[in-house]
Amino acid sequence: MCMTDVVIAWVDGDDPAHKRKKAQYLTGKNETKFDDVAGAMRYRSTGEIYYCVASVLRYAPWAREIYIVTDSQDPHVDEFVAHNFPDNTIPIELVDHKVLFRGYEQYLPTFNSLAISTMLWRIPGISDSFLYFND
């Protein structure tokens, strides 16, 4: 039996709540200075989460579990999977940043994928080896 999980970091940058949260931390900052690292293009959601999940389900049926790491958001992949992969047996679980950063809440919110990546090992029940995708 395969013991490899899949982790997908995902954010819906078009979500009004996410935009407000991010703006709260950029207010008063030089916007052009942050365009490269915090510009809207870096957070735009174009449905890539569905392509990623579909690719895993189709080409990695040996995966044990899929974890979608997000900041209080839900990509609603369950409906997509039920419709397109009715025989799917791979569990899909949402993992909030608060779970990853438990004990380090002072560093939240974070909009830095590198900071998030360093905490993936803290996903409860994650396998020793996992594939990491970042939208």
Tell where the protein language model's regions lie, with residue ranges.
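Short, acidic, metal-binding catalytic loop of nucleotide-sugar glycosyltransferases
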Residues: S55-A63
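Short beta-strand-to-loop acidic/aromatic patch adjacent to the donor-nucleotide binding site
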Residues: S127-D135
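N-proximal low-complexity "stem/linker" segments adjacent to membrane-targeting elements
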Residues: M1-Y43, G47
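Short beta-strand/loop segment that forms part of the nucleotide-sugar
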Residues: R64-Q73
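A general structural motif
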Residues: M1-M3, A63, S127-D128
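Active-site-proximal specificity loops/subdomain of glycosyltransferases
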Residues: L26-R44, D74-S127
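Structural beta-sheet core signal
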Residues: V6-I8, I68, Y132
